[in-house]
């Protein structure tokens, strides 16, 4: 089996490791952080598959700014990405290079699963392991079964999701409904929030997104997607 996370192919295809999206994703999950119960003014956090480590750093900074002592661990299959995370976030206390089910520690107050579950083949088994690792789990799950992605799937002669797998390393593709169903099967959902990426792409100052906004068809997709979200029941 090809290990795209250690043969550098994933980083070659995604050289920024999505740092341009970090602030947007953090703002989406920030609303959940105040719900995490902190005992004795201390919190132990595990960031799984944290990419460049920027979202983990923002979470860590959030608790530090609130006067909380943080123990922060990063777990990843990729040794190179762990080095990048440590460089971007020197306050990481421990890096763990193994799969989730091999994690040598437990009793985490918070586990971060930000854009990770779609990469893991055994997602059901992984969810059970996560329940053993931590008291609170924050997921961010990309919604890739939607109106426009289905159109792209049909237009590509049913090859679109195969290409997405090669490009992004995604094994599973979720709709909003299937993501909620997955979470309910394995966890007690305390809160959830959905903000489509169209708003991020539409207003981000990131150079590639600025260029994309000059594309006529891309603009149509963004505007219609945002309109649907704003005008249909959620």
Kindly give the residue locations of the regions a language model identified.
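A short, conserved alpha-helix within the catalytic core of class I
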Residues: 120-132
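Active-site loop signature of alpha/beta-hydrolase-fold enzymes
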Residues: 80, 103, 119, 144-147
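Flexible, active-site-proximal loop/turn residues at the rims of small-molecule/cofactor binding pockets
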Residues: 117, 126, 143
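Short glycine-dipeptide loop
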Residues: 133-137
């Amino acid at each position: 089996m090809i290990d795209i996370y250690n043969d550098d192919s994933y980083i070659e295809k995604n050289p920024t490791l999505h740092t341009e999206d970090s602030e947007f994703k953090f703002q989406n999950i920030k609303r959940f952080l105040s719900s995490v119960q902190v005992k004795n003014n201390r919190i132990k956090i595990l960031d799984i598959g944290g990419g460049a480590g920027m979202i983990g750093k923002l979470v860590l900074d959030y608790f530090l700014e609130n006067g909380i002592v943080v123990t922060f661990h990063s777990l990843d299959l990729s040794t190179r990405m762990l080095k990048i995370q440590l460089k971007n976030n020197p306050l990481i206390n421990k890096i763990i290079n193994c799969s989730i089910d091999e994690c040598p520690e437990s009793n985490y107050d918070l586990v971060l699963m930000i854009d990770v579950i779609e990469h893991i083949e055994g997602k059901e088994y992984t969810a059970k392991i996560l329940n053993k690792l931590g008291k609170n789990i924050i997921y961010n799950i990309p919604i890739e079964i939607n109106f426009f992605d289905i159109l792209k799937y049909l237009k590509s002669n049913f090859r679109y999701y195969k290409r997405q797998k090669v490009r992004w390393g995604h094994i599973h593709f979720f709709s909003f409904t299937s993501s909620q169903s997955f979470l309910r099967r394995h966890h007690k959902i305390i809160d959830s929030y959905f903000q489509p990426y169209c708003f991020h792409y539409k207003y981000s100052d990131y150079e590639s997104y600025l260029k994309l906004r000059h594309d006529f068809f891309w603009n149509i997709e963004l505007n219609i997607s945002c309109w649907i979200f704003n005008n249909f029941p959620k």
